[in-house]
Amino acid sequence: MTRWPFNLLLLLSVAVRDCSNHRTVLTVGYLTALTGDLKTRQGLAISGALTMALDEVNKDPNLLPNVYLDLRWNDTKGDTVLATKAITEMICDGIATIFGPEGPCYVEAIVSQSRNIPMISYKCAEYRASAIPTFARTEPPDTQVVKSLLALLRYYAWNKFSILYEDVWSPVADLLKDQATKRNMTINHKQSFIDNRVKCCEQMLDCCRSGYWYQLVQNTMNRTRIYVFLGAANSLVDFMSSMETAGLFARGEYMVIFVDMMVYSEREAEKYLRRVDQITFMSNCHSTENFNQMARSLLVVASTPPTKDYIQFTKQVQKYSSKPPFNLEIPRLFVESNFSKFISIYAAYLYDSVKLYAWAVDKMLREETRVLTDDVIFEVASNGTRVIDTIIKNRTYMSITGSKIKIDQYGDSEGNFSVLAYKPHKWNNSNNMPCNYHMVPVAYFHQGEEHPEYKLINGSIDWPSGGEKPADEPMCGFANELCKKDDTHYTSTVAAVVLGVLLFCSGVITMSIYRKWKIELEIEGLLWKIDPNEIKGYSGNEIVSSPSKVSLMSAQSYGSRWTNQFVTSTGRLRGAVVRIKELKFPRKRDISREIMKEMRLLRELRHDNINSFIGASVEPTRILLVTDYCAKGSLYDIIENEDIKLDDLFIASLIHDLIKGMIYIHNSQLVYHGNLKSSNCVVTSRWMLQVTDFGLHELRQCAENESIGEHQHYRNQLWRAPELLRNHIHGSQKGDVYAFAIIMYEIFSRKGPFGQINFEPKEIVDYVKKLPLKGEDPFRPEVESIIEAESCPDYVLACIRDCWAEDPEERPEFSVIRNRLKKMRGGKTKNIMDQMMEMMEKYANNLEDIVTERTRLLCEEKMKTEDLLHRMLPQSVAEKLTMGQGVEPVSYDLVTIYFSDIVGFTAMSAESTPLQVVNFLNDLYTVFDRIIRGYDVYKVETIGDAYMVVSGLPIKNGDRHAGEIASMALELLHAVKQHRIAHRPNETLKLRIGMHTGPVVAGVVGLTMPRYCLFGDTVNTASRMESNGEALKIHISNKCKLALDKLGGGYITEKRGLVNMKGKGDVVTWWLTGANENAIQKKLVDMMDMPPPLFSRPRKSPKLNPDSRQPSIQAMHFCGTGSRRQSTVPRAMDGESTYSLQGSVRESPRMVSKRDRDRERPPINGLGAGHFVGGALLESAQASLSTLNHSETNETNCDMDGGSGGVSGSGSGLVRQPNALHKPLAMVRPHRIISAAQLPQLGDNDDDSADTLLRESRSLDPMPMQQLRKRHDRVKLPPSKLSKNNSRSLDTGVSLISGNPNGEVHSSQLDLDNEMTANPVDATDGYDDELGLLMRHDNGQLPALRYSGSFPNAQISIVPTGRSAGGGGGGREGGGSNCAKHLNNNCNGGVNVEDDLESPLLQRQASLSVPPEEMLAHNKRWHSLEHMDGPGGHGGNSVSYAADIDNRHPGDLDFFSGSSNQHHRSKAAGGSKLTNWMTNIFKGNGVRSGEARRVGILPSGVHGARTGFTDMAASAAARDRESIV
């Protein structure tokens, strides 16, 4: 018990010792790049410097004694995203600081700043990070070298220099320029360059050229002496080589300063003088003759190399790198070599960053006044702003490299740089070649308080000149602007100027003398004078002339004296045709100097509308004036030639040519024409008018007075102005305007200069010369004739009158005239010939379009021909035949052949007409052909009732051939059971089928009509299997049965037993009775890919809309006309025949005579409360088995407009109910018709959203959306317009597609008139679908819509239908109660008001009770050569079928209407039946009668309605089955 104080004291001492040994653990983060795409990554080499620094800090008792620095590191691969992710995770895990990252650091620095975590980077030169307060770095950024550069430039007084830099150095270049400018230094050039030659050549830049550097030197050498080069070492070598080539180093005047941020290495210093790829192949230390001179012109600013102790540091780094946590093993190759090569300066930067951080935290903890708990220590150590401020305030730190490094105000290390120069230094280069000179450090920069100080090491630099350093500019400046000119130079300059002035004056005098001499030569005729011997084809005695023609009126007015006109001739001068005008004189005529000058002036005049003066041939008594020849003669000749029609364009072009020519003359030295008249306006072969016979007035007047008589003299004066006639002067500009007015009058009147004035020329001249009295109009040509002829516009006539005004000053200038007559050309600036050429070019282009169109049509016809051939023969066979190649027979090991015939066909053929037999086989084989499309089979031929199909050729299909034939046969047998014979509906078609499997040989037989035939016993055996079979059964051979068994048991067979066959004896055969899910299934056939019927191809017709992309659906809202590429034959399902498709055939109603119409039309008592139920065409009777079992309906969710409704009739009109569906059918793809079994369900459906059921048409082209956008609002039927006494035909709607302006219908057009009925419509342009309109009428009227098929000129009419029930007679109630409400109760004639709403009015094929020659209706096809309508029936009202096929709610009564269809009436079906039959074959309807489809189906008990088809009396037999009319 007495020892417990001692034990307590011992425990306390132990606790105190443990507390004194406790150290807070701070985790530091390290981001490096060990792997990745960073080319300069250093993580593998320098990471050991971090662990070395951390180990030294943790072991140093004087540095962070209570703190233990732990390490966490990440390999960021130099990627910013990975580095950011690592920093985020480290911060969340509570690190105190981050060393790194390696590579980009700006984003990472911002992230650390956001959490105030200090970041010290050892390898990041991104200058943007300097502004972040929590960021510092031990690697000096590139911009830090600027301070050292400026210290070097200031030291040597290089205040003018040029900067050449690569793009990555642009921040350094910008900072250098900015700092140099602040220090009053001059930047001569600042120019960037591109070092990447591959990039230069890919982008076709200037740097791709071999002379790029030489050009750069040439552009800068004359304005600089000092270059600061910022770029790669290879670029430096190329640049200095170009300077050496330019001879810039010969005199030692140029200096290049290169900047290298890497630490100087003696072994790598060769890169400053030679390209890296040239060092290996060095043969000596001096690669060129002037190499030493060039090398001395280079100074390099590089990072100061470390001390010798640095080598020991690198070895320690290597050891630590191989230890945990990095465990980086050094390759043996590196171990054997000098490892110092692989430990870069960045290891020292990394080491310094750790030591700098530890020092700063230690200082902060020593200054901390709080108790140093773990939380306090972590808070101090992770305070980024405070840590970085502590580092910055210290200003300097001692680096492991042995240098004292300064830190600037942003926390960036300013680095330690040295200057390298070419000095004597013995060393061995990379090829172990001894060299005496090398780039070695010659100076360093001492870090001062503000700026580094430049200090030399051991002497001076060897300058290239051998003595003084190069100056930054020449002594007298780059442009000698600093040197004063001495007297000698000044005297020489003055002498040179005086001599130059004297030479210039002498030259001017000489040129003046020469020009005067040349003018004299021109005047004397050396240029304009023509030797008479040069003119060929002309003589004074044999003049080939083209005398001007005189009009008949002129000849009558002036007599024969008008024919003595002055004429011109043609000749040839130097091979060219020229126009020659002869001036004759009675005696020798001397050419004065003034005339010679004028001839020279005439020769210099050149303009498109001036007839060029070539020269003159001077003889003693005559002068020949030679000008250009104009093939069309003079304007006077054209005006007097009545065969030439002058239209407005022609006249405008001639007048404007004349105006342009006169403007040129008036602006020339000639000043005026003086002799302007229509005979002096000539026209070239291009119908361009040119003015001629201007100038030389003295010669012309003298020659004229001597050579012509008085009459001709005065006639030539008819174009002269009054003032010229009175004063006898040669001419003036205003006189030319007067002559222009006379010429304009000539052109428009074409009756001479003064029209029909019956005066002699002398009298006319006297009247013109006479001054008019006051208020009297001057004597001018009469203009009443051109006013009456309306050949001259008013503004032209006003211009003429202004131009021949008596007062010359009132006459306009030609420039004003041109503006006033601009309207004549209609804005066109080209002349006649240019416009004609433009028209010809358009015509040629049009011809090219026509040729292209014809070529396209030819290609289409070729495609049709190839299509026909491919239908007759297999595609591979047809292609060989098309290419002219022979088709060799091919043997097939196993195929399966199908044969079938019709039992009792011979008897049926004997009892039927040929046309009925043909139609029957066509319907049957149409079903067959549609079914076999879904199987891999080939139809060989059909002969009569025989149908032959094969599988396994011409393309082999392995063992599937038997299954393909078997599945096809089962479906054909099922379809036959559903099929009904059109002319014998009570009889069942008995098909007998046989199948056999075996080898065959297939080949083409024949040349004229080649056929693809099969040969071999297999064909005969298959035929025997069919002939020995039974009706409605499939008889197969034993081989076929075995082939089917190989397919997995998908087919059900029944053994028949032994059957004796001709040529085979007793053979075992089988019945094929069915198939299960393992059988070969029918492949889906895309309806879009199915080819159209061969003989229903569209024919070109101008009636068709050229838009071939529009759907061919009749009477559809918002739809266009039928497509030329689309067939109007409705597309059926596999089980449907032509017989079962009659419900979609468009029919044409008959014309009803007015007498019958008046007799049969019942009174209108109002429309009652009936309403439209559906807009869908329903398939025939409920009992019809030809409708598909798998029909689909189109269920659409349409937008509702209001409540529920449709269109109902009440009182005297139709009332549009709300909730009408407005979704256009173009938005919904049509679907199949529902089966007859579904019809009662539709009839009982009272839902307003009843589905619209449509038969799918062959044309599935979508409606163009632009037409949907441009459609007009639908026109509704106003209830007020169906008055009691109104039933006239209704034109409603808007012609949306045709754009017919008459298509717009107003409310006043929507009346019905009892005195009118429906117009006949053209059904030959019908579309693929027609939907019946189901109606109910409570007052005995059945309004029906009729829509013409000739869209867009369509007409929709509402006509009163129905007559008294019961035998076609009396009251409308009679027999009404006997009419059933559904299709299986058929009746003919009228429709009673009590009839059920859901009883549809449908179309069907003619029954046996009506002979085919009486069934006159159009088969729905494309436009044909002849439209035929059936003859009228037995009287009664015509009924048209509903056209409301839009996908909308029943009762939504919207109509289309175009212009009246009176011009589209069908031609009557006249002529013999043979003619009609041949016409339908041409139409593509096959051999069926073109009259076989004008049919209709009415519910039983419905009488009196004129359907537009041949009427048929109701019979008991007809009432028991589907009534076929």
UniProtKB/Swiss-Prot annotation:
Glycosylation sites: 74, 184, 222, 338, 383, 394, 416, 428, 458
Residue ranges of every copy of the Guanylate cyclase domain listed in the record: 896-1026
Gene Ontology MF, one: metal ion binding
Subcellular location: Cell membrane
Keyword Aminoacyl-tRNA synthetase: no
Similarity-based family: Belongs to the adenylyl cyclase class-4/guanylyl cyclase family.
Protein name: Receptor-type guanylate cyclase Gyc76C
Provenance organism: Drosophila melanogaster (Fruit fly)
